């Protein structure tokens, strides 16, 4: 392992964040710390994970939800200090690593089967 990877691993262990096991297709609730002026509050963003990018400290994932008939996607950095917690609500059964095809679908065709036998958090 080279020096940069070693430093990233040390930083990840120093952050001491508990990240649940999640995969594309899972429905997650991401609690985000939002600062508005002097007030700080926690905002929940619930949706389907359509992509996961494993890059050590720079890992990220994209969550998609439909809000008022409009598709909303948000990219989150896994180790960001703005993320309070990640909670897996439902496990999805998919055969792809990237679910970008959900962008062009709506209604029943955009549904994802639930993985049977898997227990959500």
From Swiss-Prot:
GO MF annotations in UniProt: structural constituent of ribosome
Gene Ontology cellular component annotations, sorted alphabetically: cytosolic large ribosomal subunit
GO process terms (BP): translation
Keywords, sorted A to Z: Ribonucleoprotein, Ribosomal protein
Pfam families (UniProt xref): Ribosomal_L19 (PF01245)
Domain of life: Bacteria
Alphabetical list of InterPro entries matching this protein: Ribosomal_bL19, Ribosomal_bL19_CS, Ribosomal_bL19_sf, Translation_prot_SH3-like_sf
NCBIfam families per UniProt: rplS_bact
UniProt xrefs under PANTHER family: LARGE RIBOSOMAL SUBUNIT PROTEIN BL19M, RIBOSOMAL PROTEIN L19
Family assignment from sequence similarity: Belongs to the bacterial ribosomal protein bL19 family.
Purpose: This protein is located at the 30S-50S ribosomal subunit interface and may play a role in the structure and function of the aminoacyl-tRNA binding site.
Protein name: Large ribosomal subunit protein bL19
């Amino acid at each position: 392992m080279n020096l940069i990877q070693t430093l990233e691993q040390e930083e990840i262990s120093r952050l001491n964040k508990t990240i649940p096991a999640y995969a594309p297709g899972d429905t997650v609730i991401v609690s985000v710390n939002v600062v508005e002026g002097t007030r700080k509050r926690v905002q929940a963003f619930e949706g389907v994970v359509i992509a996961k990018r494993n890059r050590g400290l720079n890992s990220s994932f994209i969550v998609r939800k439909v809000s008022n008939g409009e598709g909303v996607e948000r990219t989150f950095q896994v180790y960001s200090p703005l993320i309070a917690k990640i909670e897996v609500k439902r496990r999805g059964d998919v055969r792809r690593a990237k679910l970008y095809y959900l962008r062009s679908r709506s209604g029943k065709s955009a549904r994802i089967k639930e993985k049977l036998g898997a227990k959500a958090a």
